[in-house]
């Protein structure tokens, strides 16, 4: 597609996909992806990074919650990576976990992050998993 992704074209862009891997960096785009994936019945694999922490979840899948049910409001101005920064390798770690979640869904492995939020701390290598 040779266009900007927005709410006017989200359904058309995503309608022939089986999974959406969110690699965006802002709430507005994630909310648009969430709305479209929910309407189309397509899982959304969310990944977010801020400073030394990354979050991963699978939304709109196996009766799990949507992105906006867990993150109803944006606080982007407070949590801006331009001012707070992130450690450079964190996005690749989070992206790899997102790819793993996509593979698990494709091959039918039920032990995925639907209904859970995985939080990874790059400084301590601590992983916390929260039931949503």
Residue ranges and their predicted role:
Residues 1-10:
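Conserved SAM/SAH-binding loop
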Residues 9-19, 23-132:
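Glycine-rich phosphate/adenylate-binding loop
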């Amino acid at each position: 597609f040779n266009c900007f992704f927005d709410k006017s074209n989200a359904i058309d862009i995503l309608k022939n996909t089986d999974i959406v891997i969110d690699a965006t960096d802002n709430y507005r785009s994630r909310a648009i992806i969430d709305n479209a994936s929910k309407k189309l019945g397509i899982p959304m694999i969310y990944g977010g990074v801020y400073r030394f922490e990354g979050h991963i979840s699978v939304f709109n899948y196996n009766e799990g919650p949507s992105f906006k049910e867990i993150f109803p409001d944006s606080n982007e101005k407070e949590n801006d990576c331009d001012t707070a920064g992130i450690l450079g390798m964190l996005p690749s770690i989070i992206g790899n976990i997102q790819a793993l979640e996509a593979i698990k869904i494709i091959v039918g492995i039920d032990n995925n992050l639907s209904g859970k939020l995985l939080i990874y701390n790059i400084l301590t290598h601590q992983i916390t998993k929260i039931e949503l």
